[in-house]
Regions:
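Juxtamembrane regions of bacterial inner-membrane/periplasmic proteins
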Residues: 2-279
Length: 279
């Protein structure tokens, strides 16, 4: 190689980090702007006096017909059940639960299939609100970065309010208000502790697991997961004893007093049945 060619090669090599940085910024900056725009407008706009949720981005901009329920009208039992069922360390992590990610990898690697999901409520919120449904490493990277940024920007209570207003509880059933009307023929504010736990049970796979709520024939896994969520609520101290008793006594099937689990056992219990795919 001539000295001139060698010099050109070294010059290009020196420019490579700058080119990679430019590519990263071209991907990162628009995504961050989109995220923060979404945070600014997440308080729902009201075209007709009723609050609606607008999907900010994605393959198709869509107006979901989910009535917005303010935090003051969401029963504490619903918040407790969702946190216990979806993200037990929600109030401890900063958007991404790295311990849960590590454990999910270990459990799934050992099982040879997706058995345990690792996404936090914040990650699910970013994924469901700002990202397309297409799975890719780029989408996962944006989900992780978005969750970290969202947690820096928004309080935990606001995240929960947003999540409960946009999460899917069944086919075209978005938000806690629609779920309450669809499954229990009442408004979200009137949900009992038992009904809140039942809704939390189906969240990982609402389009499949909602059959138990629709038919009122509760599958064995539905009953086991109900007991697990009640157990986690008790361990985490998310509800008063009186509401915990109601969650057990009002259940549509027998719910005994489950033994207390240690922290490692609690994390290990966050698995899906064999035929389901981790989040």
């Amino acid at each position: 190689m001539s000295s001139a060619s060698s010099e050109r090669f070294r010059r290009r090599l020196r420019l490579l980090p700058l080119a990679l940085l430019a590519l990263f910024l071209a991907w990162f900056v628009p995504w961050v702007l989109t995220l923060y725009l979404g945070v600014l407008v997440y308080f729902p706009y009201k075209p007709d006096g009723k609050s609606r949720y607008v999907r900010v981005t994605g393959p198709v901009a869509a107006l979901f017909g989910a009535d917005w329920t303010p935090r003051s009208e969401i029963p504490k039992a619903c918040v407790a059940a969702v946190v216990a069922g979806e993200d037990a360390r929600f109030f401890e992590h900063r958007g991404v639960d790295w311990e849960s990610v590590r454990l999910s990898y270990r459990v799934n690697e050992k099982a040879g299939r997706p058995k345990r999901g690792g996404s936090t409520i914040t990650q699910q919120l970013v994924k469901n609100t700002f990202l397309s449904r297409k799975r890719s490493y780029v989408r996962k990277a944006r989900e992780l970065v978005g969750a970290l940024l969202l947690d820096l920007t928004m309080s935990k209570e606001s995240q929960l309010t947003w999540y409960l207003n946009v999460v899917e509880f069944g086919p075209n059933v978005y938000g806690i208000e629609r779920a309450a009307q669809y499954y229990f023929k009442k408004g979200a504010a009137k949900l009992t502790p038992s009904e809140c736990v039942q809704l939390a049970v189906i969240l990982p796979r609402p389009n499949r697991w909602n059959r138990s709520l629709v038919t009122r024939r509760y599958a064995p896994f539905f009953q086991r997961r109900y007991r697990t969520i009640c157990n986690r609520i008790r361990i985490l101290g998310l509800l008063e004893d009186a509401d915990m008793r109601l969650a057990r006594t009002q259940a549509p099937f027998p719910v005994g007093e489950a033994p207390l689990l240690s922290a490692p056992q609690l994390r290990e219990s966050e698995t899906l049945p064999p035929h389901e795919e981790g989040r």
